[in-house]
Amino acid sequence: MNRPERLQPGVKLRDADKVSRIPVKIVPSERDTMLRKPDWLRVKLPASNQRILDIKQALRSNGLHSVCEEASCPNLAECFNHGTATFMILGAICTRRCPFCDVAHGRPLKPDAEEPVKLAQTIRDMKLKYVVITSVDRDDLRDGGAQHFADCIREIRKLNPAIKIEILVPDFRGRIDAALDILATEPPDVFNHNLETAPMHYRKARPGANYQWSLDLLKRFKERHPNVPTKSGLMMGLGETNEEIAQVLRDLREHKVEMLTLGQYLQPSKFHLPVERYVPPAEFDELKALADELGFTHAACGPLVRSSYHADLQAQGKEVK
């Protein structure tokens, strides 16, 4: 039996190379079998792209990454044009192979010790008042990357004392206690961890993750930091039912999660999980009504909503769709 080829540090695997060894095999989609994108998912491009180019240049010049680009977010033009970005720390190579995600898989390089300072300087230069920091999964690190998150928060606040910081963290598989101990030294203003989908779809969508583990991470952070809002996000269109999503909302509230994002899954390439249906806006409205009824302090529900989409407005409790 041939052994899998050893991954070389820093090499990005995408598309078929990325999903070749996940539990549920994906047959590449044929163009004539892919669902036609409905009109409500059409994104309007801004009249000018100068602001977009300026932000991309600021990221490149400091060796930084945005999840907006790495994950092919449909809202990139809108967010960049408004001068906001979600920064992705710890490199652009993930140790997981989630087949809904467009971030590359591989063997990551050692964390950049200068990244926290460069990130803080870039945020200062961009004059941001609210920033979202996320990361790839780093199962290769003893703390899952928690210390790097804490270092980034500390350096950002040094140069930007009035800023609000939201972190969107991985699940810290097998190292929750160590990660939470570290994050307690530099707690964020909002703590976000995405469940992504209903539990019965984890095997195909989130190989290596565990639904209950993710819920416990959110609850245990809240127990340590009762005044810091907790937040989670979900996608629709992966084969789940609305009732399954409704049960996830109930589970989130039982685990003291206060903020919610719910959006439409979009297939990044033919090698990723196919979209099984496009959820009409009216169904998102129904789920938002349920979220409000369950007691979420803020629920952003709509086809183009993403976890960090207008995160500053979400944190202020303003309507986002």
Swiss-Prot record:
Keywords on record: 4Fe-4S, Cytoplasm, Iron, Iron-sulfur, Metal-binding, S-adenosyl-L-methionine, Transferase
Family stated for the protein in its record: Belongs to the radical SAM superfamily. Lipoyl synthase family.
E.C. number(s) listed in UniProt: 2.8.1.8
Molecular function in Gene Ontology: 4 iron, 4 sulfur cluster binding; lipoate synthase activity; metal ion binding
Cofactor: [4Fe-4S] cluster
Major location category of this protein: cytoplasm
Cofactor note as given: Binds 2 [4Fe-4S] clusters per subunit. One cluster is coordinated with 3 cysteines and an exchangeable S-adenosyl-L-methionine.
Pfam families: Radical_SAM
Binding site for [4Fe-4S] cluster 2: 94, 98, 101
InterPro entries, alphabetized: Aldolase_TIM, Elp3/MiaA/NifB-like_rSAM, Lipoyl_synth, rSAM
A GO CC term attached to the entry: cytoplasm
Keyword Iron-sulfur: yes
Intracellular or extracellular location(s): Cytoplasm
Annotated HAMAP family: Lipoyl_synth
Catalytic activity: [[Fe-S] cluster scaffold protein carrying a second [4Fe-4S](2+) cluster] + N(6)-octanoyl-L-lysyl-[protein] + 2 oxidized [2Fe-2S]-[ferredoxin] + 2 S-adenosyl-L-methionine + 4 H(+) = [[Fe-S] cluster scaffold protein] + N(6)-[(R)-dihydrolipoyl]-L-lysyl-[protein] + 4 Fe(3+) + 2 hydrogen sulfide + 2 5'-deoxyadenosine + 2 L-methionine + 2 reduced [2Fe-2S]-[ferredoxin]
Protein name: Lipoyl synthase
Organism: Shewanella sp. (strain W3-18-1)
Pathway: Protein modification; protein lipoylation via endogenous pathway; protein N(6)-(lipoyl)lysine from octanoyl-[acyl-carrier-protein]: step 2/2
Cytoplasm found in the keyword field: yes
Leading EC class: transferase
NCBIfam families recorded: lipA, PRK05481.1, PRK12928.1
All copies of domain Radical SAM core, residue ranges: 80-297
Binding site residues for [4Fe-4S] cluster 1: 68, 73, 79, 308
